[in-house]
From Swiss-Prot:
Keyword Lyase (UniProt): yes
Pathway, per record: Aromatic compound metabolism; 3-phenylpropanoate degradation
InterPro entries named among the record's database cross-references: Fumarylacetoacetase-like_C, Fumarylacetoacetase_C_sf, Hydratase-Decarb/MhpD_sf, Keto_pentenoate-hydratase
Alphabetically ordered keywords of this record: Aromatic hydrocarbons catabolism, Lyase
EC identifiers of the protein: 4.2.1.80
Name used for this protein in its record: 2-keto-4-pentenoate hydratase
Cofactor(s) required for function per UniProt: a divalent metal cation
Reaction catalysis annotation: (S)-4-hydroxy-2-oxopentanoate = (2Z)-2-hydroxypenta-2,4-dienoate + H2O
Translocase found in the keyword field: no
Positions of transmembrane segments: none
Function: Catalyzes the conversion of 2-hydroxypentadienoic acid (enolic form of 2-oxopent-4-enoate) to 4-hydroxy-2-ketopentanoic acid.
Record GO biological process: 3-phenylpropionate catabolic process
Name of the top EC class for this enzyme: lyase
């Protein structure tokens, strides 16, 4: 089978898994020689279809920003996926569990850009100058791969295991906050389920954002004004078992809530 046929076939398998809410075997089993280029090509097929169907691209998410997770998956870099407007929910707006497969939540810092990032090598100064503000965020990650049995190839192809996201409503200028010092707690009904801080995200969320900005320029699709960037998890992700509300509090950025309904 040619690479083009394999790309189309695996992209279709992921779409079917999402529409049926039935997980599939790891894609790497069908393509053991698959590399990052092939995985991103699979992701792009499905992203292009979403755009062709009228969905609006609003930004990017960065994954694998934890050194421990990178080691687990045998990679030395993060990955990225696409964010569409259809994936965005408001603070406390109910998200139907029936639309998800095996969801988990993680607390993150989101950056909203006000300028394009077109330099081949972006500095912290470039990022700070291009960012309108930061927000607390919760990403709902989900995997179409059975039992979350993923490696780098699987998660990249699966839009970096992204599903939905919720942004907080307290915009903060980067000059007014130290992103590395942002302590995070993720709770449900007052029980702390996850803790972390900004250093968990490649040492500084701006490191992750710089990596993404450089990568997107190399791909010919630079980050643009208005884009949302989810910079990566500040602590361990938490499986969503049933309907309920998860609250992420990030010091300096306030709180944001992800609510799930049956």
């Amino acid at each position: 089978m040619s690479d083009d046929n394999r790309i189309e076939s695996m992209a279709a398998r992921l779409r079917e898994a999402q529409s049926s809410r039935q997980t599939i075997a790891p894609l790497r089993e069908a393509c053991p020689e698959g590399d990052a280029t092939l995985a991103y090509a699979i992701q792009q097929v499905n992203n292009d279809l979403r755009a062709a169907n009228g969905e609006r691209l609003v930004g990017r998410k960065i994954g694998l920003t934890s050194p421990a997770v990178q080691k687990q998956l045998g990679v030395g870099q993060p990955d990225f996926g696409a964010l569409f407007a259809s994936m965005a929910y408001g603070d406390s707006q109910p998200m139907p569990l029936a639309s998800l497969v095996q969801p988990k939540v993680e607390a993150e810092i989101a950056l909203v850009l006000e300028r394009d990032l077109t330099a081949e090598k972006n500095t912290f100064a470039d990022l700070i100058g291009a960012t309108a503000y930061a927000l607390a965020a919760i990403e709902v990650v989900d995997s179409r791969i059975r039992d979350w049995d993923i490696r780098f190839f699987d998660t990249v192809a699966d839009n970096a295991s992204s599903a939905l996201f919720v942004l907080g409503s307290r915009p903060v200028l980067l000059r007014d906050i130290d992103l590395t010092a942002c302590a995070m707690t993720l709770t449900q009904d007052g029980e702390i389920l996850s803790r972390g801080n900004g250093t968990a995200c490649l040492g500084n969320p701006l490191n992750a954002a710089a990596w993404l900005a450089d990568r997107m320029v190399r791909l010919g699709t630079p980050l643009r004004a208005g884009d949302i960037v989810l910079t990566g998890a500040l602590g361990p992700m938490v499986a969503v078992k049933a309907a309920g509300t998860y609250t992420a509090h990030i010091e300096g950025l306030g709180s944001v809530r992800a609510s799930f309904s049956e």
